[in-house]
């Protein structure tokens, strides 16, 4: 039995979909009763639990031998993951699969990488078999700009002229599901990227083609990005951490292209054009 933690988010919902399609036994950890009812209505078994309430986890982990976890960008994310790792070890979980990030390590040059790296190290020291799926920037993150693209034909990011090897969340999930369901992925770290590195202008061109109308990339400063993030309610510490990642784009540190997705899943990684076409309506296509 697999426990999916974070099963209502961008990556986790795809993991749930793939496991359900494969008719594999799993349950999703859910703390919100409304979301539990929604998943139950789709035939997904759920378990009540909250990473911020460790006492709720032992019951949810009953009968579970594999765990997949992805957590949101929140101030207490390290503690949330740590609580699950401790509970999983105590429950006798055999294989712990975690979505982290490219370059995640305790000595990463960026804060988010260090946060994720701390939990990776905890899993490695736990005695459980582990697999880390380490994505770069998600294509789905562009959906947060969909309204601006529809209304103004523009999106704003602090990437300069740098290129990013955007990855589709569906491919991140596919790698995770392979790790959960097929042998040979134990104790492996899988950095995953899309099949091509694109500049902001190239992303805009792909969105234009999908939407059937002009879309323009507007490069903004890190300070402008911070103001936008904190203006939407993000804590300043997290906005600063995100800006550390964005700052890696102009020197093309985010432009590396790896073949992990086809090697692990047996199918090519999705292109940005495929993603844009799949979400054309969100970006303003008639």
From Swiss-Prot:
GO terms for molecular function: oxidoreductase activity. Optimum temperature is 41 degrees Celsius. NADP(+) binds at residues 6-11, 31, 136-141. It holds the Pfam family NmrA. It comes from the Bacteria. It is an enzyme of class 1 (oxidoreductase). The keyword NAD applies. Coiled coil: none annotated. InterPro entries: Ergot_Alk_Oxidoreductase, NAD(P)-bd_dom_sf, NmrA-like. Keywords: NAD, NADP, Oxidoreductase. Belongs to the NmrA-type oxidoreductase family. Azoreductase type 3 subfamily. Monomer. Catalyzes the reductive cleavage of azo bond in aromatic azo compounds to the corresponding amines. Uses preferentially NADPH rather than NADH as an electron donor for its activity. The enzyme reductively cleaved Orange II and carboxy-Orange II, and can also reduce several sulfonated structural analogs, which carry a hydroxy group in the 2 position of the naphthol ring. PANTHER family: PRESTALK A DIFFERENTIATION PROTEIN A (PTHR43162:SF1), PTHR43162. This is NAD(P)H azoreductase. It comes from Xenophilus azovorans. The lineage of its organism: Bacteria, Pseudomonadati, Pseudomonadota, Betaproteobacteria, Burkholderiales. The gene is azoB.
């Amino acid at each position: 039995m697999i426990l999916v933690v974070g099963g209502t988010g961008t990556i986790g919902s795809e993991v749930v979909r793939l496991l359900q399609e494969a008719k594999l036994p799993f349950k999703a950890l859910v703390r919100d009763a409304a979301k539990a009812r929604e998943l139950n209505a789709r035939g997904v078994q759920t378990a009540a639990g909250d990473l911020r309430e460790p006492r709720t986890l032992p019951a949810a982990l009953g009968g579970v031998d594999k765990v997949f976890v992805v957590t949101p960008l929140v101030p207490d994310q390290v503690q949330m993951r740590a609580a699950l790792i401790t509970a999983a070890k105590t429950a006798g979980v055999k294989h712990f699969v975690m979505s982290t990030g490219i370059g995640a390590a305790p000595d990463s040059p960026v804060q988010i990488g260090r946060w994720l790296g701390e939990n990776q190290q905890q899993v490695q020291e736990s005695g459980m078999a582990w697999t880390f799926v380490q994505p770069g920037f998600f294509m789905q993150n562009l959906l947060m700009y969909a309204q601006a693209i529809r209304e103004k034909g523009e999106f704003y990011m602090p990437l300069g002229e740098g290129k990013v090897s955007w990855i589709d969340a569906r491919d991140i999930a596919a790698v995770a599901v392979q790790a959960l369901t097929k042998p040979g992925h134990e104790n492996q770290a899988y950095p995953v990227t899309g099949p091509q590195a694109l500049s902001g202008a190239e992303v805009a061109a792909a969105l234009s083609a999908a939407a059937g109308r002009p879309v323009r990339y507007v490069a903004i400063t890190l300070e402008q990005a911070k103001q936008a993030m904190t203006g939407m309610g993000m804590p300043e510490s997290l906005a600063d951490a995100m800006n550390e990642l964005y700052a890696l784009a102009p020197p093309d540190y985010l432009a590396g292209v790896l073949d992990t997705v086809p090697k692990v899943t047996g199918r090519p990684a999705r292109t940005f054009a495929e993603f844009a076409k799949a979400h054309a309506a969100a970006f303003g296509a008639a």
